[in-house]
Amino acid sequence: MSTETDVLVLGGAGVDTIVYVPELPLPFADSYMVPRIEMRAGQTGDFVALGLSALGLRTHHLDMIGADHAGDLIRALHRDRGIPLTEVPLPGGTKRAVNLVGPDGRRLSLYDDSRSHEADRLPEETVRALAAVSRHAHVSITYPCAFALPLLREAGLTVSTDLHNWDGTNPYHEPFAHEADVVFVSTTALADPERTMRQIAERGRARVVVATAGAEGAYLLADGEITHVPVVTPPAPVIDSNGAGDAFASGFLLGWLSGEPAARCARYGAIAGAFACTVPATGTDSIGRDALLARLAELDAAAAGAGA
């Protein structure tokens, strides 16, 4: 099959309003003076697309976007970064969120759930046409991407997804968890991460499950075994954790689509995620392939020296 796209990213296009707050959780008060409030394009699908493209993978983004100013910001972001964007009209308006960012880089995200409607769909003919020329699909959990999963399977694509802060029981996430070959999930809301990881693999198609754990690194389930993925020291001070999970997924997929072992892919992801933590919430910079591979070589050399 001839392909012109390495990764087709579905969903996750939106705009965030970034509010820097003095602390999290934010104590109740009638008002606060904050350093600044800024709006910028970039939610999970956008960041994965940006990360993949920066790593040299041919990337195409498909999602529903509104005919509004927020939608214009998304269109401009993709145009400026040279990432093809196929947009389907979203009658309820472009997806939006407010991110409260604390001094330590942690964030609290508030998502506007009024934008999507039950009848929203990505047209089957559009999904099929883009899938026919793609190697792999990364599917965001935003509505209505779940309806596209069978079409991607019919096209023979491998699939990845990020369940974010799934609690392991919410049924909304299950189609994504069970239809993907590579599953990313945060440990934040999981009572028993190992149990959830194994259930994902047992009940679905996943060959690899990665549970990211912030400053603790990540956990990788591959070939029936769970191993710890050490955190990578960021190349600069940590400013904001926003987008770190998306960067991890992008780095991992670079390795996976290159045929690297899962453990090696996870190192790619850890390096990309560490870089993302040094980027302000208002920014959209991603690590490039050369920088990632150079950092990987440094880590390999350090490990070899320690074992000598």
Located regions from the model:
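Short acidic/glycine-enriched loop/turn segments that link adjacent beta-strands
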Residues: 92-95
